[in-house]
């Protein structure tokens, strides 16, 4: 509990789990930490980039955070790993590592940087992000507080900058990013992330098991029963895992695209996350599909808007991008954050709370542009 002396840690406790009861012996930290390292290709960089590394390299990265690889799927563009606590994606020019629970994600930064150096690449862009933790007092190492995370990240990337997106006393994201872009280039990456709380109990009952179930007929039944098969359809290569006694993860890849979903079903701390890099002019169809599966009491959606991406072009031309309140009449938008965190790169985050029965309608988001 020493971290509670840090005012930012105290603030981070507010709002994530609305009905937290300390009498619960087991409360799992669903909200993930996310680390992305993008490599600059220079003269002499291995033609396959980070894909030149075999699994031994990534196993060492995972060992550094005390997790392990459960399953893997590959295609020409992506190596996808389901981990004991979340996911790893490796592409030619980047690594994306997403971990839940009390995993000390920042401990693997030196090994990822070493992997970049080994193939004669250079670190061009780093981002570390997480939703405010549900149970921050249970975190370990550099994740005991935002101050410790900032200190650790600054030691690795001194020119990086920290941001908080959203109200500090409620649902918000902490982002630290480092940019060493030498010359402007086409910037068309896409990232849509959702965090959902208070999941539909008729759905969460499916994510309990008396044994761990890897991808197979039994997990196919779970996907069909819950509607996940509509989100991750047959066009995707998938691998999933039903945890024992509860919890579920799925990774899916299609060409250079990925989707990942992680579920904590316990009633007192039910949570699900969704992320994809799929390009779209408007994300409403994707978001609505995810909401149909989980029907959460509240959710946050965050979109990173690169200037040359499909969603970036739509946003800058004045079009809607699918996160606006008119798409979600069963929810009320409680706060919106818009931030140009580096020139030309914007982030848009909206917090939604389910409306009371009989009050369905359309509302404008409250909050401010930051």
Swiss-Prot record:
Coiled coil (UniProt feature): none
Binding site for substrate: 28, 85, 266
GO biological process assignments: positive regulation of spermidine biosynthetic process; positive regulation of trypanothione biosynthetic process; S-adenosylmethioninamine metabolic process; S-adenosylmethionine metabolic process; spermidine biosynthetic process; spermine biosynthetic process
Gene3D superfamilies the record matches: S-adenosylmethionine decarboxylase (3.60.90.10)
Traits of the deletion mutant: RNAi-mediated knockdown causes cell growth arrest followed by death. Putrescine levels are increased and the production of spermidine, glutathionyl-spermidine and trypanothione is severely reduced. In addition, expression levels of AdoMetDC prozyme and ornithine carboxylase (ODC) are increased.
Pfam families noted in UniProt: SAM_decarbox
Regulation affecting activity: Allosterically activated by AdoMetDC prozyme. Activated by putrescine and to a lesser extent by spermidine, norspermidine and spermine. Inhibited by 5'-([(Z)-4-amino-2-butenyl]methylamino)-5'-deoxyadenosine (MDL 73811).
Cofactor binding, note field: Binds 1 pyruvoyl group covalently per subunit.
Keywords: Autocatalytic cleavage, Decarboxylase, Lyase, Polyamine biosynthesis, Pyruvate, S-adenosyl-L-methionine, Schiff base, Spermidine biosynthesis, Zymogen
Cofactor: pyruvate
EC number(s) stated in the UniProt entry for this protein: 4.1.1.50
Site feature (Cleavage (non-hydrolytic)) residues: 85-86
Gene Ontology CC terms, in alphabetical order: catalytic complex; cytosol
Domain of life per record: Eukaryota
PANTHER family linked: S-ADENOSYLMETHIONINE DECARBOXYLASE, S-ADENOSYLMETHIONINE DECARBOXYLASE PROENZYME
Subunit architecture: Forms a heterodimer with catalytically inactive AdoMetDC prozyme; heterodimerization is required to activate AdoMetDC.
Family to which this protein belongs: Belongs to the eukaryotic AdoMetDC family.
Physiological role: In association with the catalytically inactive AdoMetDC prozyme, catalyzes the decarboxylation of S-adenosyl-L-methionine which is essential for the biosynthesis of the polyamine spermidine. Required for growth and survival during the bloodstream life cycle stage.
Protein name per its UniProtKB record: S-adenosylmethionine decarboxylase proenzyme
Biological source species: Trypanosoma brucei brucei
């Amino acid at each position: 509990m020493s971290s509670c002396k840090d005012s930012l840690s105290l603030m981070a406790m507010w709002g994530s789990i609305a009905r937290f009861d300390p009498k619960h012996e087991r409360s799992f930290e669903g909200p993930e930490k996310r680390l992305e390292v993008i490599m600059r290709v220079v003269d002499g960089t291995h033609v396959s980039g980070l894909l030149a590394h075999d699994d031994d390299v990534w196993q060492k990265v995972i060992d550094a955070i005390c997790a392990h690889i459960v399953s893997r799927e590959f295609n020409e563009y992506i190596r996808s790993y389901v981990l004991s606590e979340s996911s790893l994606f490796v592409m030619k020019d980047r690594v994306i590592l997403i971990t839940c629970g009390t995993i000390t994600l920042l401990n693997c930064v030196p090994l990822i940087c070493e992997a970049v150096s080994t193939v004669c690449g250079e670190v061009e862009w780093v981002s570390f992000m997480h939703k405010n933790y549900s149970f921050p007092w249970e975190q370990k190492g550099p994740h005991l507080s935002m101050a410790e995370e900032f200190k650790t990240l600054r030691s690795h990337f001194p020119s990086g900058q920290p941001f908080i997106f959203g109200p500090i006393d409620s649902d918000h994201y902490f982002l630290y990013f480092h940019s060493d872009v030498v010359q402007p280039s086409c910037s068309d990456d896409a990232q849509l992330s959702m965090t959902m709380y208070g999941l539909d109990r008729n759905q969460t009952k499916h994510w309990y098991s008396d044994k761990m179930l890897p991808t197979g007929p039994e997990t196919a039944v779970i996907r069909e029963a819950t509607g996940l098969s509509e989100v991750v359809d047959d066009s995707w290569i998938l691998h999933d895992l039903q945890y024992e006694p509860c919890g579920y993860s799925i990774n899916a890849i299609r060409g250079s695209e990925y989707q990942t979903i992680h579920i904590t079903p316990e009633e007192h701390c039910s949570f699900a996350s969704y992320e994809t890099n799929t390009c779209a002019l408007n994300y409403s169809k994707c978001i609505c599909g995810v909401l149909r599966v989980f029907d959460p009491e509240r959710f946050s959606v965050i979109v990173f808007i690169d200037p040359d991406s499909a969603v970036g072009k739509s946003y800058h031309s004045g079009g809607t991008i699918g996160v606006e309140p008119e798409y979600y009449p069963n929810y009320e938008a409680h706060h919106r954050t818009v931030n140009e965190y580096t020139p030309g790169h914007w982030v848009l985050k909206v917090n939604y709370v389910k409306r009371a029965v009989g009050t369905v309608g359309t509302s404008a988001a409250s909050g401010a542009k930051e």
